[in-house]
Design a protein with these regions (language model features):
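Alpha-helical oligomerization segments
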Residues: 182-259
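Eukaryote-skewed repeat-based solenoidal scaffolds used as protein-protein interaction platforms
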Residues: 2-212, 222
Length: 259
């Protein structure tokens, strides 16, 4: 067990539930029981179920090797749905070239997990196709992508507008990637990642995404609180992780997996 909030039985029930959901949806799609205008919404739900299953397995203590199938399935369903659905943030009639809330987190986790698991480059490129199709340019996204896809051209500016707590929820982590690439910059980056984990990762998600899910377990929506983006950024920046290695949100086993 890696999670300290719920027990193994709880997570196994989540994993079983998600497996049954995906099987049901696949059967419905195969037998044309999903309306055309609902197909991509269903695929989007399947992507979320696969990612939830992956994180629940990590929380339950599964070997990292057992997470790849869920990742690749989530990636495929996400690509099929997000290339059609427009999940960008909007207010009234205005669309913004960035994501908000759960959609922002989902993309960030998929990018981070793909880096940490060192998934196939060709498969990872599917995430870039989504971002580029909708002109989404984000500092954290691109920092992780560049570490995985070296030929990726750097962005000159980000595409978002400061609305709906993005990128405020990731403020210290964003500052960490802007530090200078020297001994002192790495020390500051390490301190900023520690601050993010201690004071921002969970607290600044209040009101949206995964916040407080462990108190809503009757709905089986809690799957663990893990900052995969912190592990990816810490590895990319080559910082000392000892100050936050045992933080409850830091996925230590995932960080060390490919070391």
């Amino acid at each position: 067990m890696r999670d300290k909030i719920k027990n193994k039985e709880y997570f196994e029930s989540i994993i079983t539930q998600k497996k049954e959901n995906i099987s049901f949806y696949l059967n419905a799609l195969k037998n044309n029981r999903v309306a055309i205008d609902r197909k991509y919404v269903v695929l989007n739900s399947m992507a979320g179920d696969c990612l939830t299953s992956l994180i629940a397995k990590y929380s339950a203590g599964y070997p990292i090797e057992d997470l790849y199938t869920d990742y690749y399935d989530a990636l495929e369903y996400m690509h099929q749905s997000w290339m059609v659905l427009d999940n960008r943030a909007y207010l009234k009639d205005t669309k913004y070239n960035h994501y908000f809330g759960s959609d922002y987190d989902l993309m960030l986790w998929m990018l981070s997990l793909g880096y940490l698991l060192d998934v196939e480059k060709q498969k990872y490129m599917l995430l870039l196709e989504i971002l580029d199709r909708f002109s989404v340019k984000d500092l954290l996204y691109e920092t992780i992508i560049k570490a995985k896809i070296s030929e990726r051209l750097p962005i000159t500016e980000e595409s978002y507008k400061m609305i709906m707590d993005m990128p405020w929820a990731y403020e210290s982590l964003r500052h960490a990637v802007k530090e200078t690439d020297d001994e002192y910059g790495k020390e500051r980056s390490s301190a900023l990642i520690e601050q993010f984990l201690n004071k921002e990762f969970y607290q600044r998600h209040k009101g949206f995404s995964f916040y407080d899910h462990h108190h809503k377990s009757n709905n089986n929506i809690y799957y663990g609180y893990w900052s995969f983006e912190s592990a990816a950024i810490a590895d990319i920046l080559f910082v000392d992780i000892s100050p936050f290695e045992n933080n409850k949100y830091f996925p230590k086993d995932m960080y060390f997996y490919k070391k």
